[in-house]
C-alpha cells in the first residue's frame, strides 16, 4: 500500500515537473533555466535588500515597492533585448535574405549583465548585514562585470 502511494506521488510529481519544464521551454526556449535563475536572483535580491533595510532601521513599503517595480523594469528590458533581435532576424530573412541570427546575442548579453548585477547586489546586501562573504566571490563578480562592460563601447556623440 505504501509503495503504491509513493509510486502515485512520484508519478504525479514527474507529470507536474515535466509540464512546468515543458511550458518554460515553450516560453523561454531551451535555456529556460537561465531565466529561472535570474528570477530566483530577483527574489533573493529583494529579500536580502528588505532584510538589510530592516536591520539598518530603514525599512519602508515605498522603498520595497520601488525595488519590486525596478525588477519588473529589468524584465521589460530583457524582453525588449530579445524582441529587437527577433524582429531584425525575421526582417533580414524575409526582406533582405540575410541571416542575422547572431543578433540574438544582444538578448543574452543583456540577461548576463543583469544577472551579474543581481548576484553582486545579493552579495553586497549580505556583506552589509554582517555576513562573511568569501572574497573570491566578490572579486570574481567584479572582474566578470568589468569584462562584460569592456566588450561594449558606446562612442560619444560630438555634435
Per-region residue spans from a language model:
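Transmembrane helix interruption/hinge and helix-loop junction motifs
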Residues: 26-34
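Alpha-helical transmembrane segments of multi-pass membrane proteins
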Residues: 38-48, 74-82, 110-121
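Hydrophobic, membrane-inserted alpha-helices
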Residues: 15-25
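Juxtamembrane helix-capping/reentrant segments at transmembrane boundaries
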Residues: 56-78
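N-terminal intrinsically disordered, cationic/polar leader segments
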Residues: 40-52, 59, 95-97
